[in-house]
Amino acid sequence: TCGALEFKQTLTKYGCNKKYYLAEAQTLVYACRIVEDGIVNIIGIKDEVLFSALPASHTDHILNTIAPYYPCFTKAENILRTGLENIGAIFHPCVCLFNAATIERHDEFWFYRDMTEQVAKFIEKFDAERLAVGKAYGIDLLNVTDWIKFAYNDTKGDTLCERMKNNPAYHDIKAPGSIFTRQ
């Protein structure tokens, strides 16, 4: 989330004076999990992922250059939008938080497939905060339920819970073995 801004600050801090193009995607193109060092299991590929450059005036140039390789990228107006649209920052901590005891007991469960309506409703409440931040900045963000359909066009279901359970890219993703997985 807003990694391009952090990267630019680092380049500036260390005095980089070369010409460069800097951009970020809202999330990974792939739904994937690491198998071991150097090996990743790609479970699904998103249909659409927001993308923006810093400065935003470079977005079209970069998109035109990489479009043959990443046709899923969709232009966002700026990196604040790509940063605030990082739904993983809502999904991952919420699902882990509401399943912390299960994870700590090392009980195996499917991260999305075992979603419950109540946990999905809590996720939507957390997401309301993200939407309010976007609105304060004049950015109309997608809510989590609509985002799944945006990213994975063929996902079935009306509710967040149904879409999480029915998204083929999420079907075989197991929960982490520790609540400290992404420190």
Q: What do these predicted ranges mean?
A:
Residues 12, 16, 67-72, 128, ...:
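Generic secondary-structure signature for well-ordered alpha-helical cores
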Residues 2, 16, 32, 72, ...:
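Generic recognition of cysteine residues
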Residues 19, 72-78, 138-146:
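Short, surface-exposed acidic
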Residues 119, 125-169:
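Small-residue-rich helix-loop
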Residues 28-126:
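Substrate/ligand-engaging "lid" and interaction regions
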Residues 1-36:
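Rossmann-like NAD(P)(H) cofactor-binding subdomain of soluble oxidoreductases
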Residues 99-111, 161-183:
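A hydrophobic C-terminal alpha-helical subdomain
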